[in-house]
């Protein structure tokens, strides 16, 4: 995030069989982000703070004083420049599929949206006195995905598909480090997204019985 001035009858298969399962929702989310970015570039400039504000980026006074709550959602699909969207979509592409297969299509969509909206809300409340900040980006939701995966991997004996706990912890550490040593980064959105993701994973995820993965896990 950047700122600018289940239980029915189940057939069980080994965990590795889940690699072939399609993560449709994650692909759709990436496509929506890219399409919105292209729209912004065609109609204006995604690096112009005022233009981004007019298109639905986060701006605390607009939400709190004018009731424009839709910004909590629209800002999740907006990015400031090509590097911003490329970095976020690369992480979502690499990690999102894993969590979607673990949660299921519907739960994953709910999870992602709640992480993004929730992190935007927390960030907004932390910047209520800041009338000069316009923010946008999917990284609050993406940090939520990382947090959700951290919980899921941890309770699955430290491993899920090709991910392990150590990889995720290192990723979280370096992502937060880069955020706190860079300018124009909404670290509050990142941290809150991470925490919200862990909480939602605790609520939504159900660990398969034994060491095997339920084929009916995708809904």
Predicted regions and their residues:
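A detector for small-residue-rich transmembrane helices and their helix-helix packing motifs
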Residues: 7-219
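Short, small-residue-biased leader/transition segments that mark boundaries at the very start
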Residues: 1-6
């Amino acid at each position: 995030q950047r700122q600018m001035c289940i239980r029915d009858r189940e057939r069980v298969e080994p965990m590795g069989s889940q690699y072939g399962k399609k993560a449709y929702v994650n692909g759709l989310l990436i496509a929506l982000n890219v399409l919105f970015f292209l729209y912004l570039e065609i109609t204006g400039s995604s690096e112009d703070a005022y233009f981004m504000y007019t298109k639905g980026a986060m701006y605390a006074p607009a939400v709190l004083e004018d009731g424009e709550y839709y910004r909590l959602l629209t800002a999740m699909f907006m990015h400031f420049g090509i590097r911003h969207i490329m970095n976020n979509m690369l992480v979502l592409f690499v990690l999102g599929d894993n969590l979607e297969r673990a949660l299921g299509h519907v739960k994953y969509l709910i999870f992602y949206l709640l992480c993004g909206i929730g992190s935007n809300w927390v960030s907004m409340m932390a910047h209520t006195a800041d009338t000069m900040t316009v923010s946008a980006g999917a990284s609050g939701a993406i940090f939520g995905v990382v947090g959700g995966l951290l919980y899921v991997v941890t309770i699955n004996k430290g491993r899920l598909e090709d991910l392990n706990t150590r990889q995720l912890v290192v990723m979280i550490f370096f992502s937060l480090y880069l955020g706190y040593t860079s300018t124009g980064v909404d670290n509050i959105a990142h941290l809150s997204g991470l925490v919200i993701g862990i909480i939602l994973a605790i609520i939504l995820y159900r660990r398969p019985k034994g060491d095997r993965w339920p084929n009916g896990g995708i809904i």
